[in-house]
Amino acid sequence: MFLGPLMLDIAGTTLTETDRVQLSHPLVGGVILFARNYESPAQLSELTASIHALRSPPLLIAVDQEGGRVQRFRDGFTRLPPMRTLGEIQDRNPDLSLHLARQIGYVLAAELKACGVDVSFTPVLDLDCEQSSVIGDRAFYREPQVVAELAHALMSGLQSVGMVAVGKHFPGHGAIQADTHVETAIDSRNYTDIEKKDLTPFRRMIDTGLSGIMAAHVIYPAIDPNPAGFSSKWLQDILRNELGFRGCIFSDDLCMQAARNYGSITHRAEQALQAGCNMVLICNDPDSADELLTSLQWEFSAVDTARLEHMRGQQTVHSMAQLHEMERFIRATEEISRISLANISVSV
């Protein structure tokens, strides 16, 4: 059995029989976890083991574990700062900010891998334009070159323990106020402006080995009337052909309000996959997931399968308890805990 193109969610902290049936469907290739699925590292490890045991090859398990307000697993995990904190440290001490970005990437990945989670949808590559409340302090910085440097450092930390990175939200969500979770989002800039600014972090990260990209549900009417995640112009012509990206393309959640204007859930999934997504997310809408599993017809290619398999990264051999005895991990978590805008006491 291959990994299918759908990533679904589950309701609770353990698998129900309904979950097992859904996740065993050949169209499914992954599971995204939320805060409601988490109680403790031990419980999470049991949950991920049960998900991985359902299929061969195992389903891909993902989470949004960025830091700051977007950190699904908190108690028992290291509290990670919002990425804007690294940008503010960069203004004072660029070398320190890069060091801390690597440390955050390492700790983030080490803890998730220890609990059986394959990938986090991070880093955010959107610019901090002080326009978007939904992005806000999730972004590293206002200048694209600095975003690229900090994101690359964080990716290096992830990769040091076998986790790949997923940059988001292509081609850039930082310059608009609208929140795609609840409304349509339109960016009226021309391609030249977007290419010079927003695409720079994506281009730099692609050139240095970025494995995954998540597309935005944002409309850029000067380029294409469809949102980027439904646009072959963005995903094929620009991302694949112009920027040379060869990794895995994820949609954002197809049940977000900005995506619901594009027909039934089946039509949305078909449009996103035809545009160039390798995997589409269906979250917080069990009825839509059921409908899609019944109605979607999709032939998955060997290239798609290879791209999804690569997102698994390398498996860790360390448990959470073992991590807490490792000198590298102890030092990294101590440094992260001392991050303060007023008093940076970490030495590189």
Swiss-Prot record:
Family affiliation: Belongs to the glycosyl hydrolase 3 family. NagZ subfamily.
Residue positions of the active site: 181, 252
Pfam families cross-referenced by the UniProt entry: Glyco_hydro_3
Pathway listed: Cell wall biogenesis; peptidoglycan recycling
Entries under NCBIfam families matching the protein: PRK05337.1
UniProt KW keywords: Cell cycle, Cell division, Cell shape, Cell wall biogenesis/degradation, Cytoplasm, Glycosidase, Hydrolase, Peptidoglycan synthesis
UniProt keyword Secreted present: no
Main function: Plays a role in peptidoglycan recycling by cleaving the terminal beta-1,4-linked N-acetylglucosamine (GlcNAc) from peptide-linked peptidoglycan fragments, giving rise to free GlcNAc, anhydro-N-acetylmuramic acid and anhydro-N-acetylmuramic acid-linked peptides.
InterPro entries for this protein: Beta_hexosaminidase_bac, Glyco_hydro_3_N, Glyco_hydro_3_N_sf, Glycoside_hydrolase_SF, NagZ_Beta-hexosaminidase
UniProt binding sites for substrate: 64, 72, 138, 168-169
Species of provenance: Nitrosomonas eutropha (strain DSM 101675 / C91 / Nm57)
GO cellular component, one term: cytoplasm
UniProt site positions, description: Important for catalytic activity: 179
Subcellular location: Cytoplasm
Full protein name: Beta-hexosaminidase
HAMAP family cross-referenced by the UniProt entry: NagZ (MF_00364)
Upper classification of the organism: Bacteria, Pseudomonadati, Pseudomonadota, Betaproteobacteria, Nitrosomonadales
Enzyme Commission number, as recorded: 3.2.1.52
GO terms of molecular function: beta-N-acetylhexosaminidase activity
Chloroplast is among the record's keywords: no
GO BP: carbohydrate metabolic process; cell division; cell wall organization; peptidoglycan biosynthetic process; peptidoglycan turnover; regulation of cell shape
Reaction(s) catalysed by this chain's protein: Hydrolysis of terminal non-reducing N-acetyl-D-hexosamine residues in N-acetyl-beta-D-hexosaminides
